[in-house]
Curated annotation (Swiss-Prot):
GO terms for molecular function: ATP binding; ATP hydrolysis activity; helicase activity; single-stranded DNA binding; zinc ion binding. Belongs to the MCM family. Residues 1-81, 120-220 are annotated as: Disordered. Its EC number is 3.6.4.12. This is DNA replication licensing factor MCM2. A zinc finger (C4-type) spans 380-406. The gene is MCM2. The lineage of its organism: Eukaryota, Viridiplantae, Streptophyta, Embryophyta, Tracheophyta. Coiled coil: none annotated. Widely expressed, with higher expression in developing tissues. It is found in: Nucleus. A motif (Arginine finger) lies at residues 706-709. Keywords: ATP-binding, Cell cycle, DNA replication, DNA-binding, Helicase, Hydrolase, Metal-binding, Nucleotide-binding, Nucleus, Zinc, Zinc-finger. GO terms for biological process: cell cycle DNA replication; DNA replication; double-strand break repair via break-induced replication; embryo development ending in seed dormancy; mitotic DNA replication initiation; regulation of cell population proliferation; regulation of root meristem growth.
Length: 961
C-alpha cells in the first residue's frame, strides 16, 4: 500500500487521522482504504461518513479528535443562553486605537496584492488539507442561492446536490455485515428498499437511467404544483424525471394488499409477461391512483406524454430484470386497465379530446393490417445522403426541409431498407343494441389498433376499449362540409372482451375454492338443474338437457385428421306459451359466447358466412354469421321451423362437422363453427298431436332431426292439479317482483299457517346464483376433460341394440349411430358437471335416461306406455322416489276426477278428491317401491296439499273453489 492510500482520511470529521495510526491487524472499511471508493463523481460527497468504522477499544480517546468532531457538528446557536450574546458590556464595546492609522495608505500595486491574495489562498488550502475539511469554495455555487424559489425549473447538478444532503445517521456495526462493509438486504429488496431483480443491484440500474434523479420533500411538493397548462407541464424535463422516478418505485415496490405472500405485484406480472413472451404490461389504474393520485390524474388528462415516460421506464425495468429480453422485444407497452370512468359513445364531446377514455360497443368492421411508418430515413436524390432517422407517430408528420450536405430542398425519397414500420389496424365500434335509446340510430367510433393489439377483436364481438381520444385531419370531411372539420378516433391502449369477464385468468382463488367446494356436494347435479331458469315452473327434462348442453362433452380429434364433435344439440318442440323462448333467453344471459337469432330474421348467409366488398379497400372480405360468431359457445335459434329449407340445409355441415365451407368470389376457405345449437320450434298447426309421430308434427327433415342429440316435446295438457300449481307459482313470482314501495300484503294476501304452499314458494336455498353458475361452467369447461372407460361402452352398446329393436316397431324418430355418440357426449357432460376427470357408471346411466326420455316423448301416445314399461329400469334412475310417487298420485287424482265428472256430470262442484292408499301401493309396486311411509311424511306430500286418513285408508286432496 502506497503513502497516498495510507494518508487517506477515514472520516471527514477527524482531522489528521489516517490509517497508519492503526495496529497492523486492524481492518478498515472500504470507504477508508479502497481507492476505488474515491471517484471524481464523489470527491465532493461525504462518502465515508457512514461507512468507516473504528473500534473504540483500539484507539484511546483523543481530546483533539473529539473537539474536532464536535466542531464539525457545529454549535447550537439557539440554546438557552443565546440572549447572553446581546447583553451590554462597556469594557468590550470599544475599538482599540493602537495600530490604527487612517492616514496610512497601501502602496502595493495590483500585482503585489494579487500575489499576496494567492499566497493567503494557498495557506488556507494547505490548512484545509491538514485538517481534512473540504474547502467547498466553488464559484458556480456563489452565483445562485440554494433557497430561492424564483426558478424551480433549474436543475442542480448531482454533485452540487450531494453537498447539501441532510446528514445521515451513523450506522451501527452488525455482526452479519459482510467484508466490504455493506449490510445484506432483505430478500427481494435492494438497499434502497426496492426489488433488485436478482443479480442486478439498484446502484447499477440507476447509474445508466437518464430519468434517475433525486428529489427532496420540497422538490416533490413543487412538482405537484402545476404551472401553466397540464400538457405543457408534463413535457418539462424535471417533471418527466419525477414521473419516471415515482413510476419506477411503483413497479418495483408495490405490494397488493390481497396478496398474502406479500410479493411485489408488478415484479410478478413482469415475470409472467416474460414467460408468456409478451410485450404488454398491464397496470391497474385503481392501484396506481391509490399510491400516486396526482400522477394518475395527469395520466388520465395528458396521457400522451405520461405514457411515453411510463413505457420508457417499464422498458428499462424489464430489461434490467431480464437482460436477454431486449433481444426478443425492443419495446414494452404499458396498458392501463380498470379506468374507473366509463363513457357512452354518444356522450363523447370536445372536452374528452386528448384524454384517456373507456368506451364499449360491438365491432362491426375490421380492416386489414397495414404498415405504418415508425422510424423513417430519407435519401437525398441529388447527393445520396441518408437523412434520419425521423420518428413518426400519430400526432406529428415528418417533413424534411433541406439536405445538410448539399443544402438542396429535395426531392427526398424514403429509404425502404432502413425504414422501420409498425402494424396498424382500424376497427369500427358501434353502440351495443341494448343501450341505444328508442327511436335513435346507433352511433359508432373509429378505433386504431397498433403493435400487439392487432387482431385482438373480430366483427360481432362486444369489447371495451381504453384509449386516447384524439383527432386527425380528414380531407373528405372538409370537402363534404365546406369548412375545416377533424375526424376523431380512439387510439386504443387496452382492449378487453366482455365475454372474457369470466375467463380463466379472471377467476380469483376464492372463486376456484368455492367452485371446488360446490363440486364435493353429492347433489350438485340436481342443484345445477334447479338453477337453470328457476323462474320457469317444471320442465325438469328440458332443464337437464340444457344443463348438459351448456357443459358439453369432450371433443375428439382422431390423429389430427378426423374430428368428432363434443357439443350437444337440443331441439325444443312444443305448444305455444310453454316458455321455450324464455329458456333460450336464459341461456343467452348465462352461457359463454351465446348468440341469439330467429329463424325468420336469419338467412343462410346470416347463420353461416357472407362475402361482401369492403367500402374502403374495395376488396372482397369474409364476414362470419351467427354460427361463426358463436364458435366455442352456444348458438340459439328461435322459431327454427319458420326458416326456409335452403337456409336450414346450410347449417347441416355446421351442426355435425362444426365447420362452414365457403367458395364465393374467389374465396375458398373453411370457417370454424364449434358450437352447440339449441333451437325452439312450434308444431304444425300450432298444437302437438300425440296421435301422430314426431316427424308428422314438425316441418323438419330426418337429416336435421338426427343431428339433434336431445328432442324435448312440451305439451300443454289440461290438468287441474298441475294448472293450480302453475298458477300459484306465476302469481307468487309476480308478487315477489313488484317494484320498490309496493305493498305486497294488499296485492297477494298470504298466511303461512293457512296456506300450506307458502313454504314451497319461498326461495330454494339449493339454487345457485347466475354469476356463480357462469363461473362454475367456465371453470369446468377449461379445467375438466373427462375420459370414458371400456366397461361403460358395453352397457351403451346393449342399450343401443334394444333401442334399435324397439324403434323398428314404432313410428317415432329412427335410432341411428349418432345416438351412440350422443350418449357418450352426455356422459362426459354429466361427469364434467361434477368436475370428474373420468366417466363413471352414474354418468352413463344419467345419459341413457335423458336419451330414453327424448326417444319415448317422440312416439305416439299408445306406444309410449309400452316403451316406458320396457325401459323402466333405466328411466327411474336417480329420480327421487318421492317425486315419482307424487307423479303417480297426481295421475290417480286426475283419473278419479275424470270418473266423477262422467258419473255426476261436468256441472257438479267437488270440494275434494279421495284416492285409496291401496291404489297408490299397486302403482308403486310396478316401479319396485314397497314402502310408502317416507313419502307420506315428506315435504312433497305435505306441500302439495295432500292429507292422509289412515283410519279410512284414503288420501284427501282439496280442490280450488
Amino acid at each position: 500500500m502506497d503513502d497516498s492510500e495510507n494518508n487517506a482520511p477515514s472520516t471527514p470529521g477527524s482531522p489528521g487521522f489516517s490509517t497508519d495510526r492503526l495496529p497492523p491487524n486492524t481492518t478498515t472499511s472500504r470507504g477508508a482504504t479502497d481507492p476505488s471508493s474515491y471517484s471524481d463523481d464523489d470527491d465532493d460527497d461525504v462518502v465515508g461518513a457512514e461507512e468507516a468504522e473504528v473500534d473504540p477499544n483500539v484507539l484511546p480517546e483523543d481530546d483533539g479528535v473529539v473537539a474536532a468532531e464536535e466542531e464539525e457538528d457545529g454549535e447550537d446557536l439557539f440554546n438557552d443562553n443565546y440572549l447572553d450574546d446581546y447583553r451590554r458590556m462597556d469594557e468590550q464595546d470599544q475599538y482599540e486605537s493602537v495600530g490604527l492609522d487612517d492616514s496610512i495608505e497601501d502602496e502595493r500595486n495590483l500585482d503585489e496584492i494579487m500575489a499576496d491574495r494567492r499566497a493567503a489562498e494557498a495557506e488556507l488550502d494547505a490548512r484545509d488539507v491538514r485538517t481534512g475539511a473540504a474547502p467547498d469554495r466553488k464559484l458556480p455555487r456563489m452565483l445562485h442561492d440554494q433557497d430561492t424559489d424564483e426558478d424551480m425549473s433549474f436543475r442542480r447538478p448531482k454533485r452540487h446536490r450531494a453537498n447539501f444532503r441532510p446528514p445521515r445517521e451513523p450506522r451501527t456495526p452488525r455482526s452479519d455485515d459482510d467484508g466490504d462493509g455493506a449490510t445484506p438486504s432483505s430478500p427481494g429488496r435492494s438497499q434502497r428498499g426496492m426489488y433488485s431483480g436478482g443479480d442486478v443491484p439498484m446502484t447499477d440500474q440507476t447509474d445508466d437511467d437518464p430519468y434517475e434523479d433525486e428529489f427532496d420533500e420540497e422538490d416533490e411538493m413543487n412538482m405537484y404544483r402545476v404551472q401553466g397548462t397540464l400538457r405543457e407541464w408534463v413535457t418539462r424535463d424535471e417533471v418527466r424525471r419525477f414521473i419516471a422516478k415515482k413510476f419506477k418505485e411503483f413497479l418495483l415496490t408495490y405490494v397488493n394488499p390481497k396478496n398474502e405472500q406479500g410479493e411485489f405485484e408488478y415484479v410478478r406480472l413482469i415475470n409472467e409477461m416474460v414467460l408468456a413472451n409478451k410485450c404488454s404490461l398491464e397496470i391497474d389504474y385503481k392501484q396506481f391512483i391509490y399510491i400516486h393520485p396526482n400522477i394518475a390524474i395527469w395520466l388520465a388528462d395528458a396521457p400522451q406524454s405520461v405514457l411515453e415516460v411510463m413505457e420508457e421506464v417499464a422498458k428499462n425495468v424489464v430489461f434490467d430484470l431480464h437482460k436477454n429480453y431486449r433481444n426478443i422485444h425492443q419495446k414494452i407497452y404499458v396498458r392501463i386497465t380498470n379506468l374507473p370512468v366509463y363513457d357512452q359513445i354518444r356522450n363523447i364531446r370536445q372536452i374528452h379530446l386528448n384524454t384517456m377514455i373507456r368506451i364499449g360497443g360491438v365491432v362491426t368492421r375490421r380492416s386489414g393490417v397495414f404498415p405504418q411508418l415508425q422510424q423513417v430515413k430519407f435519401d437525398c436524390s441529388k447527393c445520396g445522403t441518408v437523412l434520419g432517422p425521423f420518428f413518426q407517430n400519430s400526432y406529428t408528420e415528418v417533413k424534411v426541409g433541406s439536405c445538410p450536405e448539399c443544402q438542396s430542398k429535395g426531392p427526398f425519397t424514403i429509404n425502404v431498407e432502413q425504414t422501420i414500420y409498425r402494424n396498424y389496424q382500424k376497427l369500427t365500434l358501434q353502440e351495443s343494441p341494448g343501450i341505444v335509446p328508442a327511436g335513435r340510430l346507433p352511433r359508432y367510433k373509429e378505433v386504431i389498433l397498433l403493435n400487439d393489439l392487432i387482431d385482438c377483436a373480430r366483427p360481432g364481438e362486444e369489447i371495451e376499449v381504453t384509449g386516447i381520444y384524439t383527432n386527425n385531419f380528414d380531407l373528405s370531411l372538409n370537402t363534404k362540409n365546406g369548412f375545416p372539420v377533424f375526424a376523431t378516433v380512439v387510439e386504443a391502449n387496452y382492449v378487453a372482451k366482455k365475454q372474457d369477464l369470466f375467463s380463466a385468468y379472471k377467476l380469483t382463488d376464492e372463486d376456484k375454492a368455492e367452485i371446488e367446494k360446490l363440486a364435493k356436494d353429492p347433489r350438485i347435479g340436481e342443484r345445477i338443474v334447479k338453477s337453470i331458469a328457476p323462474s320457469i315452473y317444471g320442465h325438469e327434462d328440458i332443464k337437464t338437457a340444457i344443463a348438459l348442453a351448456m357443459f358439453g362433452g369432450q371433443e375428439k380429434n382422431v390423429k389430427g385428421k378426423h374430428r368428432l364433435r363434443g357439443d350437444i344439440n337440443v331441439l325444443l318442440l312444443g305448444d305455444p306459451g310453454t316458455a321455450k323462448s324464455q329458456f333460450l333467453k336464459y341461456v343467452e344471459k348465462t352461457g359463454h359466447r351465446a348468440v341469439y337469432t330467429t329463424g325468420k330474421g336469419a338467412s343462410a348467409v346470416g347463420l353461416t358466412a357472407a362475402v361482401h366488398k369492403d367500402p374502403v379497400t374495395r376488396e372482397w372480405t369474409l364476414e362470419g354469421g351467427a354460427l361463426v360468431l358463436a364458435d366455442r359457445g352456444i348458438c340459439l335459434i328461435d322459431e327454427f321451423d319458420k326458416m326456409n329449407d335452403q337456409d336450414r340445409v346450410s347449417i347441416h355441415e355446421a351442426m355435425e362437422q362444426q365447420s362452414i365451407s365457403i367458395s364465393k368470389a374467389g374465396i375458398v376457405t373453411s370457417l370454424q363453427a364449434r358450437c352447440s345449437v339449441i333451437a325452439a320450434a312450434n308444431p304444425i298447426g300450432g298444437r302437438y298431436d300425440s296421435s301422430k309421430t314426431f316427424t308428422q308434427n314438425v316441418e323438419l327433415t330426418d337429416p336435421i332431426i338426427s343431428r339433434f342429440d336431445v328432442l324435448c316435446v312440451v305439451k300443454d295438457i289440461v290438468d287441474p292439479f298441475t294448472d293450480e300449481m302453475l298458477a300459484r307459482f306465476v302469481v307468487d313470482s309476480h308478487a315477489r317482483s313488484q317494484p320498490k314501495g309496493a305493498n305486497l300484503e294488499d296485492r297477494v294476501p298470504t298466511d303461512v299457517e293457512d296456506d300450506p304452499l307458502a313454504a314451497a314458494r319461498q326461495a330454494d336455498p339449493d339454487i345457485l346464483s347466475q354469476d356463480m353458475l357462469k363461473k362454475y361452467i367456465t371453470y369446468a369447461k377449461l379445467n375438466v376433460f373427462p375420459k370414458i372407460h371400456d366397461a361403460d361402452l358395453d352397457k351403451i352398446s346393449h342399450v343401443y341394440a334394444e333401442l334399435r329393436r324397439e324403434s323398428s316397431h314404432g313410428q317415432g324418430v329412427p335410432i341411428a349411430v349418432r345416438h351412440i355418440e350422443s350418449i357418450i357426449r352426455m356422459s362426459e357432460a354429466h361427469a364434467r358437471m361434477h368436475l370428474r376427470s373420468y366417466v363413471s357408471q352414474e354418468d352413463v346411466d344419467m345419459a341413457i335416461r335423458v336419451l330414453l326420455d327424448s326417444f319415448i316423448s317422440t312416439q305416439k301416445f299408445g306406444v309410449q306406455k309400452a316403451l316406458q314399461k320396457n325401459f323402466r329400469k333405466y328411466m327411474t334412475y336417480k329420480k327421487d322416489y318421492n317425486e315419482l310417487l307424487l307423479l303417480l298420485l297426481r295421475t290417480l287424482v286426475k283419473d278419479v276426477l275424470h270418473f266423477e265428472e262422467i258419473v255426476s256430470g261436468p256441472t257438479t262442484r267437488l270440494t275434494h278428491i279421495e284416492v285409496k292408499v291401496e291404489d297408490l301401493k299397486n302403482k308403486a309396486q310396478e316401479y319396485e317401491i314397497y314402502d310408502l311411509r317416507p313419502f307420506f311424511s315428506s315435504a312433497h306430500f305435505r306441500d302439495n296439499n295432500f292429507v292422509l286418513d289412515e283410519g279410512r285408508g284414503i288420501i284427501r286432496h282439496p280442490l280450488a273453489a
